[in-house]
From Swiss-Prot:
Oligomeric and partner information: Homotrimer.
Molecular function per GO: acyl-[acyl-carrier-protein]-UDP-N-acetylglucosamine O-acyltransferase activity
Organism, as annotated: Shigella boydii serotype 18 (strain CDC 3083-94 / BS512)
Pathway annotation: Glycolipid biosynthesis; lipid IV(A) biosynthesis; lipid IV(A) from (3R)-3-hydroxytetradecanoyl-[acyl-carrier-protein] and UDP-N-acetyl-alpha-D-glucosamine: step 1/6
Name of the protein in its database record: Acyl-[acyl-carrier-protein]--UDP-N-acetylglucosamine O-acyltransferase
């Protein structure tokens, strides 16, 4: 169904069964598949292809030649009706690709809200991207990667399958991430290694001086104490009792499967 207030350019193809919300804009030469939902106020500039079982929220801006919901590149994929879900107010720039999930990975590729996906960024099958993240030009997420809120991934950076990028992380450009990056950390290189805490980013987001100090102390326990991760976990958990921001580390440890960058 196409809402009466939506605009669909005469050269665009919106297949029967698609849902186009109020005040949405489907620009020239766009293709919208039959199982696609486009939310209120979302704009497809031109030459955008959205197919598969894909739901896109409201007030997104999607630029030319982006491809969303296409068949993934997992050789095990056999045509199952797996999905893509995208939240609200995202800016998805030229030639971004976001692939549908796989049955083996839960069947869903999910992008939250208020993200900036720059030119040529790639989000593979079964990835989860949180809110207010930035993927710079040519950043590439392999399958099953998780990117937590406020993370920034630099241009030309590749993230290995099943890795987790923690909240408020900043990964420098041209990096290769092969293990999990704990929250608040700056990482750079191939293979990516830690370079301290993202202090400037935390200041901009309103973290108190005391909270930043506690986060730095947790970082030092992980990377500079000479102890194993299992040895420092109780100390970090104790620190989190006073500073809730530190709890992001303990939650992260419970999710990590690939080990931490070193």
């Amino acid at each position: 169904m196409i809402d009466k207030s939506a605009f669909v350019h005469p050269t665009a193809i919106v297949e029967e069964g698609a849902s186009i919300g109020a005040n949405a804009h489907i620009g020239p030469f766009c293709i919208v598949g039959p199982h696609v939902g486009i939310g209120e106020g979302t704009v497809l500039k031109s030459h955008v292809v959205v197919n598969g079982h894909t739901k896109i929220g409201r007030d997104n801006e999607i630029y030319q030649f982006a491809s969303i919901g296409e068949v993934n590149q997992d050789l095990k994929y056999a045509g199952e009706p797996t999905r893509v879900e995208i939240g609200d107010r995202n800016r998805i720039r030229e030639s971004v690709t976001i692939h549908r999930g796989t049955v083996q990975g839960g069947g869903l590729t999910k992008v939250g809200s208020d993200n900036l996906l720059m030119i040529n960024a790639h989000i593979a099958h079964d990835c989860t991207v949180g809110n207010r993240c930035i993927l710079a030009n040519n950043a590439t997420l392999a399958g099953h990667v998780s990117v937590d809120d406020f993370a920034i991934i630099g241009g030309m950076t590749a993230v290995h399958q099943f890795c987790i990028i923690g909240a408020h992380v900043m990964v420098g450009g041209c990096s290769g991430v092969a293990q999990d990056v704990p929250p608040y950390v700056i990482a750079q290189g191939n293979h990516a290694t830690p370079f301290g805490v993202n202090i400037e980013g935390l200041k901009r987001r309103g973290f108190s001086r005391e909270a930043i100090t506690a986060i730095r102390n947790a970082y030092k326990l992980i990377y500079r104490s000479g102890k194993t991760l299992d040895e420092v976990k109780p100390e970090i958990a104790e620190l989190a009792e006073t500073y809730p921001e530190v709890k992001a580390f303990t939650d992260f440890f419970s999710r990590s499967t690939r080990g931490l960058i070193r």
